[in-house]
Amino acid sequence: MQQDSHTHGIDMSALGRNKQGLQLAEETVAIEVPGLSLFYGDKQALFDVSMNIPKQRVTAFIGPSGCGKSTLLRTFNRMNDLVDGCRVEGAINLYGNNIYRKGEDVAELRRRVGMVFQKPNPFPKTIYENVVYGLRIQGINKKRVLDEAVEWALKGAALWDEVKDRLHESALGLSGGQQQRLVIARTIAVEPEVLLLDEPCSALDPISTLKVEELIYELKSKYTIVIVTHNMQQAARVSDYTAFMYLGKLVEFGDTDTLFTNPAKKQTEDYITGRYG
């Protein structure tokens, strides 16, 4: 089902920059989903989804609005627990341990699996206090330890040089793109293993989006990253693997280059060529 790259508006030069020869079956698995269904009351939102998220790669979820991609993302750190009437059937194994097992420490899970949302949500505190927020919750208050964590996390989020002289000013004075990178710094300060990014660039301008995309590329050397995006160009640029979802079902999952240039399923081809969605 080979496609002319121009037919679906995806810049094929974006593909292949860091993804040569990737084989999903050969990857170390970070998150295993062996048949997951999810319900909101009587309404089923996910239907028997099975997939393996590879360690220290970027996996993108794409699909039309309402297809279940954000719902699936939020199962990875149990954010859906906060929704009344939400029920999960099946398991999600984080490095072999079922995060839905009885007695799971959900607060610790959310430290290990951090999340960044569509709209930057810095706290109405200083830049410094935003970054150390999670550390203080853990009881870490030594100034030297916090100072080092702030510098390390802000450098990791490619923000240090822009804010190092204003750490004790309000985070609300930062631009939208800076705020989103600050939120990423706050998330990585507690040293998670996985980063979940739910359309992290949808509220940002193109230049800020580019900075966040470059940051994602850098962060995958330390973290497993899963990103939900409506922007197929973005999925092509930043991800190693892509999952296409439709109406709560996983239609196709594979390396990004192949999925965009030679999809196995007609439904995937129709979506990326703009026939629907």
From Swiss-Prot:
GO terms for biological process: phosphate ion transmembrane transport. Residues 31-272 form the ABC transporter domain. It is found in: Cell inner membrane. The keyword Translocase applies. Pfam families: ABC_tran (PF00005). The complex is composed of two ATP-binding proteins (PstB), two transmembrane proteins (PstC and PstA) and a solute-binding protein (PstS). Part of the ABC transporter complex PstSACB involved in phosphate import. Responsible for energy coupling to the transport system. This is Phosphate import ATP-binding protein PstB. It comes from Pseudomonas putida. The lineage of its organism: Bacteria, Pseudomonadati, Pseudomonadota, Gammaproteobacteria, Pseudomonadales.
